């Protein structure tokens, strides 16, 4: 009898192990949900808005999906949402409470012209470059016009396993030519005036720490400090329009590079604003050494 119980127990463990989903990075276009493009690793998840939402309030901002499991959730959440189980409610794995609207969200960009953000609409084109356990990468292409000038952005995003930040390498064109020295704003949204704003320009980052549904969330962007022109607290007083921004310029190749991401208290690992700032400081050192 004991032997039978042992065999049954071992078989159960074996099946559970075989069915376990390993942590990995992942990205894909999601035509079944208004042309989203979503990406994730074992700690963080995001989405950008695509062509089907070109007439909506959303544009080129980045939305945070707050996850608290290390297995992939993108396909599961979209499938369950289509079946009536909303990803805007936490069912044990996390959820999407982060409001973006027409803002930059977490790591969106804008042209910085005459002291104002000039933003693009949703992406029009997409291409997966890489999708593996350790790293996923893709390109989103944006087009827009301003004052008779036409602009294009090829936004290459990559995400590595274990990181709380994803990397963006954006290349800009103006009137079909590589845009050198183009002023660009990169930042994160401040949802409320009570949110804690922090910055360390010597380390190259700005962040927001906020209370959210009984927990807390830190968001931030980070870039090479030598590429920062200035910090800008962009305040209009209107809903979803206040941002903390890093102002930079495109380099000789028309490019801007930076990192963006979050730490969610409910997921563990980052529990305070101070811990989030320590992480951002440490991440800068990692990128300096690469």
Task: List where the protein language model places each region.
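Residue-level recognition of well-ordered beta-strand positions that form the cores
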Residues: 139-143, 156-158, 169-171, 187, ...
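Accessory, usually C-terminal, subdomains that scaffold auxiliary metal cofactors
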Residues: 173, 190-249
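Solvent-exposed N-terminal domain segments of exported/luminal and surface proteins
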Residues: 21-117
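Extended, loop-rich substrate-binding clefts of extracytoplasmic carbohydrate-active enzymes
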Residues: 86-160
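Positively charged n-region of N-terminal signal peptides that target proteins for export
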Residues: 1-4
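Acidic (Asp/Glu-rich), glycine- and aromatic
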Residues: 153, 164-199
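Beta-strand-rich recognition/accessory modules
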Residues: 19, 224-290
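Hydrophobic h-region of N-terminal signal peptides that target proteins for export
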Residues: 9-18
